[in-house]
Amino acid sequence: MRIEVIKREGNTFEFYLEGEDHTFANLLVETLHEDKHVKFAAYSIDHPILMARKPRFKIVTDGKESPEEALEKAAQRVFDRARAVLEAWKSAIEG
């Protein structure tokens, strides 16, 4: 996974997230939408074959937090949820 910055201007951040597809991209966008300071968050895949694992993201915030801060917070929430699922899974299989 690698972030390639396309544009950073004001409260807008656009970037590619190399190595990911719709599965993670949709999860990240939905998690960004939970942030009250995020006014817009979406992704697209420019070409379904050539760029299938390189979604393009756009995040716009209200200025009370930067798009990068919103991205970091969303990534942490995704990580925390994945950890909770793993712990629940371990508890379930251990009895």
Curated annotation (Swiss-Prot):
Transmembrane parts of this sequence: none
Gene that this polypeptide is encoded by: rpo11
Subcellular compartments: Cytoplasm
GO CC, one annotated term: cytoplasm
Signal peptide positions on this chain: none
Reaction(s) this enzyme catalyzes, per UniProt: RNA(n) + a ribonucleoside 5'-triphosphate = RNA(n+1) + diphosphate
Function summary: DNA-dependent RNA polymerase (RNAP) catalyzes the transcription of DNA into RNA using the four ribonucleoside triphosphates as substrates.
SUPFAM superfamilies tied to this protein: RBP11-like subunits of RNA polymerase
Gene Ontology BP term (one): DNA-templated transcription
Record key words, sorted: Cytoplasm, DNA-directed RNA polymerase, Nucleotidyltransferase, Transcription, Transferase
HAMAP family given in the database record: RNApol_arch_Rpo11
Family from the record: Belongs to the archaeal Rpo11/eukaryotic RPB11/RPC19 RNA polymerase subunit family.
Protein name in UniProt: DNA-directed RNA polymerase subunit Rpo11
